[in-house]
Amino acid sequence: MPKAVGIDLGTTNSVIATMEGGRPEVIVNAEGARTTPSVVAYKGDERLVGQIARRQAALNPKATLFEVKRFIGRRWDEVKEEAARMPFTVKEGPGGSVRIEVNGKDLAPEQVSAEVLRKLVADASAKLGEKITDAVITVPAYFDNSQREATKQAGEIAGLNVLRVINEPTAAALAYGLERKGNETVLVFDLGGGTFDVTILELGEGVFEVRSTAGDTHLGGADFDQRIVNWLAEEFRKEHNFDLRKDPQALQRLIEAAERAKIELSNASETTISLPFITFDPETRTPLHLERTLSRAKFEELTADLLRRVRQPVEQALADAKLSASDIDEVILVGGSTRIPAVKRIVKEITGKEPNESVNPDEAVALGAAVQAGIIQGDANLGDIVLVDVTPLTLGVEVKGGMVAPMIPRNTTIPAKKTEIYTTAENNQPGVEIVVLQGERPMAADNKSLGRFKLEGIPPMPAGRPQIEVTFDIDANGILHVTAKEKTSGKEASIRIENTTTLDKSDVERMVKEAEQNAEADRKRRERVEKRNNLDSLRVQALGQLEENQSAPQDAKDRLKAAADEAEEAVRSDDDSRIERAQKQLEEAMRSFMTAAQSGSQNQAGQGAQTQTGRQEDDVIDADFKPAE
């Protein structure tokens, strides 16, 4: 059976892992790194993913996409504020969805995330020596139904069979508790690049049971970065009367500098942010520079409200689990943003415990996802592990007066299924529209609409007579399926989903084909680059041989030099057929030259030996020795 992998598709960085000998192991990428930046850049027909994309971001800000996870499965009206601070163009798409415009083309967030997944899987396949198709992908525990579906679709667009979508804190708990014995109540505090989750689990005898989960999908390390960006921009504006945030290139440099400063302040009390030539004076065209010193105290002042926001989900998770802080045995920190000293301090204040830092906050989620993949595939080394998760938000339907009728409360164990009977409000009503909602507010307008389901073909009956059976079914991925039928007549009617933020089946199929075509184009482009590089490397070797074998026959040297010169011109021309011809000519010239050079050296060696022998003969002196007495 081919290996399955676990993937942490993160806001800022992503990680892939698999089971090796009963233990989860991170798979390094093609660059040799254990984490891959969740960054995708578009340059003409070429797509760059990971560190190579991040490195060129400042020069290509409009087409370098990052933090796309913040937009996946979201409605435009939910992300306007976040969209406005990006150096690239984020806009409203069909049905109120989100689209990212790059070089005149609109991309769905799922497409961009699929590029990251494709890179992770391609690199892992190369490392493992086998093609990977099966994966468990993690999502923040507080992701709603649309965001989970969109993440699953991203996997499908990348050509993956998504075995399961699991919550990030739950995955981290799997990694933490895999080899631990005894019973524990664990609080996982997961503050990543773009989202924040708190999950409380009970661990014991191979059972990982989630008691409660809470979170904030609009809070993460990028928000802390943004406070530094705004501070730097305001400081610069006061001095030069120019807002750097309006210049995409300058904004990209600010974002990168802010992230570096935040990381440095985790280990230092202050840091210097230096950005020479950040922009030009619009009147004099002289270069302007930015240099500021940021202290840890100032950073905590800038982010004070964000730090306060991490408290409420912890308190809510404890309340929902009906536990107090003293009932928690261990506090596990997950996500790179938990390295911020103020965050650690707040966690300790709330829980009264020193956080357990035994797991790598960047890798724990992917490692746990790999464990889940192993469980699904029946890895004998794992034994009997049972994972019991919950749905993070209440699911319900809209009823008369714009109220919400809850169907499945938050923190219900999944999979879960619930059926309720509804009826009509008017006589002879031919159909009903069922609005499916997710959230905790009592009024429908204040919650997220997951979709509108129309049940049509109800026979004419007085109001209140029809019995409309609505069933909510949440699968193990936390994804909701809704069915409805009219019981009185015994007839069933079809349901169609309208106005959802996720892609329909035809969109996914189209994007899968596009991704496959892009992958083929990328392969051909990579082959062209490799051929060009191989020819150039051979040219350098040829010049080296000419340097080392100066005593070789002149005609052989001339032929090799001419072939090397043609190779140089072919590389510059970028003409495939010319490159192939030049490669053959240079290989042939190299063989001929090496043969001629060896023959020449052997002849020289032979002549040298003969001369030496002659000398020995010439040096013989005839002499009569007088015998010793």
Swiss-Prot record:
InterPro entries: ATPase_NBD, Chaperone_DnaK, Heat_shock_70_CS, HSP70_C_sf, HSP70_peptide-bd_sf, Hsp_70_fam. Residues 595-614 have a biased composition (Low complexity). Induction: By stress conditions e.g. heat shock. GO terms for molecular function: ATP binding; ATP-dependent protein folding chaperone; unfolded protein binding. Residues 555-590, 615-629 have a biased composition (Basic and acidic residues). The modification Phosphothreonine is found at T195. Residues 514-533, 543-629 are annotated as: Disordered. The keyword Cell cycle does not apply. Keywords: ATP-binding, Chaperone, Nucleotide-binding, Phosphoprotein, Stress response. Acts as a chaperone. Belongs to the heat shock protein 70 family. This is Chaperone protein DnaK. The gene is dnaK.
